[in-house]
Amino acid sequence: MTLSTEESIEMFGDINLTLGMLNKEDIVNKEDIYSHLTSVIQNTDILDDAIVQRLIYYASKDMRDNNMLREIRMLAGEVLVSLAAHDFNSVMYEVQSNFRILELPDEFVVLALAELATSYVSQSIPFMMMTLLTMQTMLRLAEDERMKGTFCIALEKFSKAIYKYVNHWRDFPYPRLDANRLSDKIFMLFWYIMEKWAPLASPMQTLSIVKAHGPTVSLLLHREDFRGYALGQVPWLLNQYKDKEIDFHVTQSLKQILTAAVLYDIGLPRSLRRSIFINLLQQICRAPEPPVKENEMKASSCFLILAHSNPGELMEFFDEQVRSNNEAIRVGILTLLRLAVNADEPRLRDHIISIERTVKIVMGDLSTKVRNSVLLLIQTMCEKSYIEAREGWPLIDYVFSQFATLNRNLEKPVKTNFHENEKEEESVRETSLEVLKTLDPLVIGMPQVLWPRILTFVVPAEYTEALEPLFSIIRILIMAEEKKQHSAKESTALVVSTGAVKLPSPQQLLARLLVISMPASLGELRGAGAIGLLKILPEIIHPKLVDLWKTRLPELLQPLEGKNISTVLWETMLLQLLKESLWKISDVAWTIQLTQDFKQQMGSYSNNSTEKKFLWKALGTTLACCQDSDFVNSQIKEFLTAPNQLGDQRQGITSILGYCAENHLDIVLKVLKTFQNQEKFFMNRCKSLFSGKKSLTKTDVMVIYGAVALHAPKKQLLSRLNQDIISQVLSLHGQCSQVLGMSVMNKDMDLQMSFTRSITEIGIAVQDAEDQGFQFSYKEMLIGYMLDFIRDEPLDSLASPIRWKALIAIRYLSKLKPQLSLQDHLNILEENIRRLLPLPPLENLKSEGQTDKDKEHIQFLYERSMDALGKLLKTMMWDNVNAEDCQEMFNLLQMWLVSQKEWERERAFQITAKVLTNDIEAPENFKIGSLLGLLAPHSCDTLPTIRQAAASSTIGLFYIKGIHLEVERLQGLQEGLESDDVQVQIKISSKIAKIVSKFIPNEEILMFLEEMLDGLESLNPTCTKACGIWMITVLKQQGAALEDQLLEILGTIYHHMPVLRQKEESFQFILEAISQIASFHMDTVVVNLLQKPLPFDRDTKTLWKALAEKPASSGKLLQALIDKLETELEDDIARVEAISVACAMYEVISMGTSVTGLYPELFTLLLKLVSCTLGQKMLTCPWSHRRHVMQQGEQQQIPDPCRLSTATLKCLQAQAMREGLAKESDEGDNLWTLLSSPSTHHIGVCSLARSMAVWQHGVILDIMEQLLSSLTSSSENYRITGAAFFSELMKEPILWKHGNLRNVLILMDQSAWDSNATLRQMAIRGLGNTASGAPHKVKKHKQLMLESIIRGLYHLARTEVVCESLKALKKILELLTDRDVSFYFKEIVLQTRTFFEDEQDDVRLTAIFLFEDLAPLTGRRWKIFFAEEIKKSLISFLLHLWDPNPKIGVACRDVLMVCIPFLGLQELYGVLDRLLDQDLPRARDFYRQFCVKLAKKNQEILWILHTHSFTFFTSTWEVIRSAAVKLTDAVVLNLTSQYVELLDREQLTTRLQALRQDPCISVQRAAEAALQTLLRRCKETSIPL
């Protein structure tokens, strides 16, 4: 082994480490160290010299150390020897240095030298002379037994090395050495050991000498001068055969000596040879202990050497020894002969006759071992052509005789050792059969030995089991001869001399070969060999058969090629060949002789064998072909009177007479009649029952009549049927059932079976006659008999074949005319079904059997009975041309097919499978849909038998309708149903469904589905799943073509839903089915479901959701609903149907159905529906016809159409938000409350519009386009909805950019003049929002818009309109100039002022904001006017600074800041700035400061404030009343005397006095303060109060 550099370094390091450990005195680990070193050294190519030297040193030292354990010393020696491969000279030097003359060496040094001599022969030979000389001086010193043994080992190995050199010196790399000098030394050593040590040697030492003996003598034989002495020592060696432990080594040494003698061509002395023969034979045949196997093999090889050198003398020795009766010696010699023959020793061939004679000597030996040995020797002799033509036949005959000996030897068994003898005889038989199988008949000389004497073994029954190889031998011989004849000019025909052997007659050969051919149908090679032999033996059988068999036999052999065929068919073919052959021969004497030969073979076969049954039929057929009527008559009489010669008398006589009747019906019937008249049947019957006499009974004769009818010529049968056959059978049956008018043995099974068999065969015969005009008058009577038999059978057991046979009889009788009525058929079938299917399970039936054979019989009866019932049902059903009648008969099985007992289901399905086979053609109108639905799901039933039968039946349904399926694929799938894995079953059933579903007639789908739905309700879980899979598969395949049946299908499904809801998995299949139908007929399904009453029940909701679950069809479903809703809302009126659509949409959308593509249409329709159902009650009560289960005290809720519609719209918006089409409403969930209320609907719509995702402007534009019509709708509610929606959208610039809102603007303007306040409000809002969405449109349409909006200011009855108008004006005015507004300015100002005191905060606030916005629009024209209007409005602004609504206070502050400049009162800004502080000033303080400033600037305005204040004293707001009083107080305080005098003191005092009684304390205090101020000011001016 070559190592890499790295590995070498690592290895050397390892060795160095190991050497370091060897240097220690640690003995314990040295054994492992040396074992490791041995492995390393032997697996390493190169070792460092220094390492080698160190290893040699340590190994040699430890090897010689007596203190070391022997095992360690031995391992050290192995290491030392292994090192010789790296440095031989150093190792040899080390060993030789410790191997010195006249010094007794260490034992292991000698062993090391010996091992070096054998392991390194080439290197050792040069040192051998010195070693031997030294060793010679040491032998005298050896006294220890172990040391002597060591020297013997050394002598053995030195001799082997020198022997190798002597015979192969040319292969050695140095010049030839003088081998004689070496052998001289070996001789001296050997002489010393044999003379000095051997006589007194212990057993152990003797063993060592024996081992050295062979190699040493073998070496010495090459020297003539030593040869005598060497051979003289062989007897000593032979004398050592004493113990099994040493015998092998003696034989081994002997073999080495014999091999050397052959090599050197040395002839051993005769006495020595004989001694060797005897000793070796004893080793092979030693008794009582068997020889050691290895020793026996060595001894055998010694004999082979002797057979090569002295074959003649060896054969003489064998001949002498084999004559003794010693079994072991005979077996040993036969075994040695077999080995010698098998070795194919050329010199042994000269002694073939001697070998044959030796074999013949022991042929009479009855010992099993001897016979087996003889057979094996004959086998080898045949293989090696050691058979001599003249003397060889007895050996072949011996082989056959030993095969047949088994039966003869066991006929009289020895009771004590019977089983042992049987085994031994069987071994002989097997050996002889093996010899025959391996016999090559074409080996030189064998054809002359075998032919034609080999034919003598064909006919005797004892050679039956050997016929297969026998036929092969005969066929090879004949075919080889034919080949020679074709290739050679001169005939080399086989020798036909038979000597004393008697050959079989042609009739015997034909009879035997025909009978033996029968098992060929079962695949037996013996049968095929027989028919093959017939093919090549026509000339031997009869010359006339050559041409016939030349054509017929190849046809006969064809069905056998590669497969088995029906036994019945094969039997028929053979009988037909026999018929044709006999007619061809046409020789009465020849036929009569064949009859006798058939009879002679009766005892050769058992009654139940196929051969025996065929033999009876062949005998009957031969009689039928015999033209001698007298002979036929006599034979029939003989069989009737002495039937026991046939074996089974009933079967035999029945078969013979039946087949004989084919050509001799008159003779058979006449002889039968005569026989009946002559025999006393009653007594005869009793004798057969009680005395055991084997004679025919009446029941036997009944059976015979049936067979005769079955085989009778059809043209003759019907004319003689009633009187000569049926009447006789009925008469015999009646006689057996009654004696002296009394019923006896009415339960006799044999009687019933015989009667049934006879009737069955008669029925078959009549049917085969094919006479359409024949009316079988006994039909109903005989069927009645059969039914009675069946009724009498127990329902809890199956012990008799009566049911089975009676069913068969009924089947054949039912086919005959006159035809039975449908009711008769149904009664017959129902009766039989009820007597078979309810039987207990098969295992329970079998448990009644006491033995395994009984159990097998019960199972056989069970299988046959079920098969017969299936065939009966099949016959009665399909013989009927009326499809409805067939269906009626099939319905008889329906209850059993769904039975809760699986064994009943199993039987029903197995029967169904027999009925639905591919060889049937159903009536034209036969419906398979319902049956398919019934059968198919059970392909996943609990039992594999049910699954297989269900699948077979399912496939069969299509075949009977003439529909051809993928046979191979279906068969493969069907086989897979054997699996117990439920998932595998479901998968296979699904595949079958996919294959066959497309072939179901369209008009039968409804029936199929009805059956499947029933199955979903009632079957087990696995079958239920199969139901669902089949239903879905069929709907997938054929759903498109179901339009005409759709409503019925849907109705059927709905009908089953309440029950199936309790079964979750089944219900899921229902939903899947609806979805599948909808995928083809969405509109129809939608319309159908919409007809469900409102509110939808749970099932209806579930159906809608199920339809929505399918991504592929959900969009289609939504579109269908949209179309339906669109149709329902065409006239802007919402009917109940529209509400149903909305509810359906809710269920669909709630399943997460994508609305992206349909959202605009959905949204507008649902919004329209909400609008149209505002305030609407349900017009009709579609739920009234449906009963609701309600709790006690619960009231039935009447659905609100608007709320239902709103709920759907809410669901839509939620989905739209998920898809990014809308956003959350600013109203939250309150939106939907607003939307569904008539009073707040427009608010909800606006909020909904604001939730539109502006970024999805494409979607909104689609919505706008569809919603545009709402503005001109005849429905006021819908117009409001549209106006409200558009009012919000009009503030979106992007929509003005991409959409056509101009038309909307025009329509909005028109709506602003509508009489409906809400509509006007929404229109005005839309106009106002235009300012945000399209400012340019405002300027363009300012006149139109302003007029419409200003008009809204006059709608005083509805503040919502006013407020909306104010807001709209504010937005629009922000975009206009004074010139744009000039024409409308005054009107706007005046109308705006009217709303400063409005009760609605929003109106007040908007009016104030608007007034502020009007300031910049006064222009020159309206500046003075506006200033005057400010004066009038100033008090409102001042008072409302403390409005309850803080926003209004801020607005008043802002408007004051804007309006002050118009009055030239800029000085007031400082006072107004105080209003900007975080904490507002007190009203009193503010007003006084304001009035102080105002009084200084403009007393007129101060007076105006006073004159307008009285109206506010009665304000509904406390804070305004208080502020008004405080302002009055400030005004009075700051009026000049002139204006004080103008005060209406009385009125003012009265009002203030009244306010002192105000509920508000603040007002009271302000009024009191104001009165005091008034009083003080009046005093100041001397004005009395």
From Swiss-Prot:
GO CC annotations on file: acrosomal vesicle; cytoplasm; sperm flagellum; sperm midpiece
Major localisation: cytoplasm
Keyword Secreted annotated: no
InterPro entries from the UniProt entry: ARM-like (IPR011989), ARM-type_fold (IPR016024), HEAT_Maestro (IPR055406), HEAT_MROH2B-like (IPR055408), Maestro-like_HEAT (IPR048465), Maestro_heat-like_prot (IPR045206), MROH2B-like_N_HEAT (IPR056282)
GO terms, biological process: cell differentiation; protein kinase A signaling; spermatogenesis
Taxonomy, superkingdom: Eukaryota
Post-translational modification: Constitutively phosphorylated on serine and threonine residues in acrosomal region of the sperm head, midpiece and flagellar regions of noncapacitated spermatozoa. Phosphorylation on tyrosine residues increases upon sperm capacitation within the acrosomal and tail regions in a protein kinase A (PKA)-dependent signaling pathway.
UniProt cross-references to SUPFAM superfamilies, sorted A to Z: ARM repeat
Name under which the protein is recorded: Maestro heat-like repeat-containing protein family member 2B
